[in-house]
């Protein structure tokens, strides 16, 4: 029995649109297409309820590192009036609660089938429809396919010799089960990225012993997750329109005024003063983009910021040998990290740091992990905080086939492409939320921006009577080239990072983001619309059978 009551406008289709995902992107897409445009929409998600990445990532310490008042949708003024955030950043349970409120308020669940994974989607050129295949055996047809698969959702689980012999429990932060108790356990954590920092600082105080297996030392500033009183929240709500106007015209969309002052021309004393103030305030993105404007582009400025953090590591960590292991040797040019007393963790008697770049993991044993030196760490639980096959991971894992049976896997075999971070050549009526070469920002504002453009494009195509729409090769390649040129203007490509796919063995290094900021991105995609979608191929002649 259909879960829909609306009439499908597309002749011969089960639905006008299928939306994959029930995170920030999927929920907003269902709202825009169903509630505002009146299309018949079916949503799918492999989780049991709404939440997307925040449904799966329930590990200890999980939270956003974005100001609470902008880690949400900007359109939900009614929910905003009711909203109450306790601290500067939202925890995972708070974010999930908010997303449930959104789903209830907009009546979104009735369009979804949960606990249902989409295995593949094939475009039928004769009908002009997508055939969407699920793991339940159901196949449905739709004119439009909108994917909110998640920027960071395809979990990366490294392969180690002997892993099946380990008698303890193995967990991944990206698929955290309920009821896990780490207290009084010997815990090993592999990975020290954003998630690793959070789970390390949350686990250290409760574990019997914590061993951190570090491949790359990280630059980590304090998180500064301060309580928010009623007066502060009232001021944020009163200033909401101005805040969001700034966010939508900013670079990283994190809710703070980005600096316009270069560190390169500042005096050493001024740099020290600004960096110290940012350290006390907390926030990874604020430290990189709110202090000076050239930390991500100038070697001189980057060195100054890196040296400041290195000095803090030396000051905080009591054991000089441990401090040396924790001190990064590369540029300060990865995703900016922040944590709750991260470096202080390594002063605890129950915490051991294993430098697995110098002494790699050789194998898992029944009782723990053995390094190549022969040193063995006995463990009850091993946690993989090893991140994700970011951006394109879920797309190449899914059986996506476009015009002529071309697969997304083959299209992106030399690296992910994508037009505006939302479309791809030979994949008609196919729209990605947070696809390759989209903006490198706080995600909810970028998601909103993309979903609104997708909805506007679909609306325009429906009004014009267009059967299918896709980008030209020239437009796609020009956009990819623009993203590469912009990335090369920064220092980010010089650091080994998941931003370019470096965390996945065998994955080719590729530019996967538009790094000129959300303001410039919004202008770029608005221009496509204002110019009459001349960069898109619009076909009115699909054969009906």
Swiss-Prot record:
Domain of life of the organism encoding this protein: Bacteria
InterPro entries reported for this sequence: FAD-binding_Monooxygenases, FAD/NAD-bd_sf, Flavin_mOase-like
Cofactor: FAD
GO molecular function: flavin adenine dinucleotide binding; N,N-dimethylaniline monooxygenase activity; NADP binding
Coiled-coil positions: none
Binding site for FAD: 24, 45, 54, 65, 71, 118
Uses in industry and biotechnology: This enzyme offers a promising route for the synthesis of chiral ene-lactones, when expressed in an engineered strain deprived of enone reductase activity.
E.C. designation(s): 1.14.13.-
Keywords of this entry: FAD, Flavoprotein, Monooxygenase, NADP, Oxidoreductase
Annotated site location: Transition state stabilizer: 335
Family: Belongs to the FAD-binding monooxygenase family.
Note from the entry: Displays a different regioselectivity from P.lavamentivorans BVMO.
Cited function: Catalyzes a Baeyer-Villiger oxidation reaction, i.e. the insertion of an oxygen atom into a carbon-carbon bond adjacent to a carbonyl, which converts ketones to esters or lactones using NADPH as an electron donor. Besides cycloalkanones, can use cyclic alpha,beta-unsaturated ketones as substrates, leading to conjugated ene-lactones. Can also act on methylated cycloalkanones and methylated cycloalkenones with high enantioselectivity in some cases.
Protein name in UniProt: Baeyer-Villiger monooxygenase
Lineage: Bacteria, Pseudomonadati, Pseudomonadota, Alphaproteobacteria, Rhodobacterales
């Amino acid at each position: 029995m259909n879960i829909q009551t609306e009439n499908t406008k597309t002749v011969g289709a089960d639905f006008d649109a299928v939306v994959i995902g029930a995170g920030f992107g999927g929920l907003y897409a269902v709202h825009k297409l169903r509630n505002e445009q009146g299309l018949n929409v079916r949503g799918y998600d492999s989780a049991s309820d709404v939440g997307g990445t925040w449904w799966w990532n329930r590990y200890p310490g999980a939270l956003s590192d974005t100001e609470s008042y902008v880690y949400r949708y900007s359109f939900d003024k009614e929910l905003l009036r009711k909203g109450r955030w306790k601290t500067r950043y939202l925890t995972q349970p708070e974010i999930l609660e908010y997303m449930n409120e959104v789903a209830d308020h907009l009546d979104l669940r009735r369009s979804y089938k949960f606990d249902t994974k989409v295995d593949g989607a094939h475009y039928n050129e004769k009908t002009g429809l997508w055939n969407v295949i699920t793991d339940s055996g159901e196949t449905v047809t739709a004119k439009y396919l909108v994917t909110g698969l998640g920027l960071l959702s395809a979990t990366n689980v490294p392969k180690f010799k002997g892993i099946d012999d380990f008698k303890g429990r193995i967990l991944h932060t990206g698929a955290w089960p309920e009821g896990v108790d780490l207290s009084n356990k010997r815990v090993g954590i592999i990975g020290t990225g954003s998630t690793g920092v959070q789970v390390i600082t949350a686990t250290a105080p409760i574990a019997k012993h914590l061993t951190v297996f570090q491949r790359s030392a990280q630059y980590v500033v304090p998180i500064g997750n301060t309580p928010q009183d009623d007066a502060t929240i009232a001021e944020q709500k009163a200033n909401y329109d101005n805040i969001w106007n700034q966010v939508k015209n900013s670079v990283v969309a994190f809710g703070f005024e980005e600096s316009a002052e270069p560190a390169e021309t500042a005096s050493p004393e001024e740099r020290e003063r600004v960096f110290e103030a940012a350290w006390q305030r907390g926030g990874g993105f604020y430290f990189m983009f709110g202090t000076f404007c050239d930390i991500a582009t100038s070697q001189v400025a980057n060195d100054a910021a890196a040296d400041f953090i290195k000095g803090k590591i030396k000051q905080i960590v009591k054991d000089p040998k441990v401090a040396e292991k924790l001190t990064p040797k590369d540029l300060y040019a990865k995703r900016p990290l922040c944590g709750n007393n991260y470096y202080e963790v390594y002063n605890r008697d129950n915490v051991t740091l294993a430098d697995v770049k110098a002494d790699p993991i050789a194998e898992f044993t029944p009782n723990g992990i053995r390094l190549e030196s022969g040193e063995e760490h006995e463990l009850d639980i091993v946690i993989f905080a090893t991140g994700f096959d970011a951006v394109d991971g879920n797309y190449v894992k899914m059986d996506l086939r476009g015009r002529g049976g071309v697969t997304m896997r083959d299209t992106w075999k030399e690296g992910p492409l994508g037009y505006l971070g939302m479309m791809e050549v030979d994949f008609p009526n196919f729209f990605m939320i947070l696809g390759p070469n989209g903006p490198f920002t706080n995600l909810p504002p970028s998601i909103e921006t993309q979903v609104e453009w997708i909805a506007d494009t679909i609306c325009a195509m429906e009004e014009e009577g267009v059967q299918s729409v896709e980008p030209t090769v020239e437009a796609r390649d020009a956009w990819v080239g623009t993203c590469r040129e912009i990335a090369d203007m920064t220092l980010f490509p010089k650091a080994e990072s998941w931003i370019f796919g470096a965390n996945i063995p065998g994955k080719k290094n590729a530019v996967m983001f538009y790094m000129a900021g959300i303001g410039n991105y919004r202008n770029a995609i608005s221009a496509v619309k204002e110019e009459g979608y001349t960069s898109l191929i619009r076909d009115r002649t699909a054969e009906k059978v």
